[in-house]
Amino acid sequence: MKNTLAETNPENKRRKFLKQLLAGTMASVAIPVIGKSISEEKQRPAWPLDKTVQNEAYWEMVKKQFPVPSNLIMLNAANLCPSPYFINELVASTMKELEMNVSFQFRSRFAEKRKKALEMMAAFIGVSKDEIGIVRNTTEANTLIVNGLDFERGDEVIIWDQNHPSNAIAWEQRAKRNGIIVKKVTLPPSPKSIDELMAPFFNAATSKTKLISFSHISNISGMALPAKEICKTARDKNILTLVDGAQSLGMMDLNLHDMGCDFYTASTHKWLLGPFENGILYMRKENTQRLWPTVISAGWKETSTTVDEKLCVLGQRNETTPFALPETLEFHLSIGKKNIEDRVRSLSANLKEKIKAKVPQATFVTPLSPEMSAGIVIINLPGKQPAEVFQKLYEVHGIAGASSGGIRLSPHIYNTLSDLDKITDALAALAV
């Protein structure tokens, strides 16, 4: 049977995107070619950032690659992001073909694409392909670690009180089940230094502490923790580290080996701009044998040594979403990981300044320091309930944010400076 996947419209979308990038005002900018390998990608020069990060003509072009109506502004990257047109169409067309042909022969391509996705994701985050597995989301990845680590009664786990429930309540349930001790630490809301963010974790540590588990970036305050410094200090004390990267994968230019964490979890449907039901589970190679598998299905082997084969054999699942992971990563690399981080940081910093100027009565939950924050901006308006403002922003102004920890706004590369003006105008109107 003829393979039509390579001839579908998503590929045309990618070609069109590349032509647009190379056209007009962007002709002088060195741009990676979509579809090239990651090794080739790293050999090509990066964009000149002084010409790109603030080049609104370019980012307006990027915005057009997403299926967001002109009357809506999406500011909920911390929860869910749209995918580019061609990713949506690739998933849809693959699902359609699967429904037409569920044979083992047709489905063999999913295993091939999964292998490619693992290789590309490993390079994307600076690890070995044997150290990562594809799961369905961050929650599942966290759960596999919480339930898989062979801790004993009396062993201690230290968690941040701003962790996601899958990295907090899950530990508390584990404590009730077999007697581990969970210590929860609170960090200062307005830290003056990195040391103030680290000290509470290590002040709580004892000789029985086995793991420190924390969100890289909090979804309820926007605070970014010094992951590399925490991981290094923990390693020096023979303490494992789990970094929940739900808010950093796809937003930050990551290298997990450089970060030094023992475990890292994330999803692709947030900042990575990928399809639903994809997550990653990373662990340092020497930690693979520390975990018991939580789920065992057909194809699992006790002799498996890779993370994907030992811990991520989860039974029948929707394989059309991992099928689009390589293209998702290619899209990111075509723009540049550092360029994306710089752009998001620029947008969030700009948003903070505009709020301070136009809505001076607003109070910031998120630290103003760029060293202690990233892409998430959370504020409160005096006398206003965040849930009420959140609803009116959407219903009256067409702005989609969130009400987690306050009024949460998280811009991404599909947002522009003109979007930020509309947002701050709306906040000023609602603050009255």
What are these regions (language model features)?
Residues K2-V432:
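Pyridoxal 5′-phosphate
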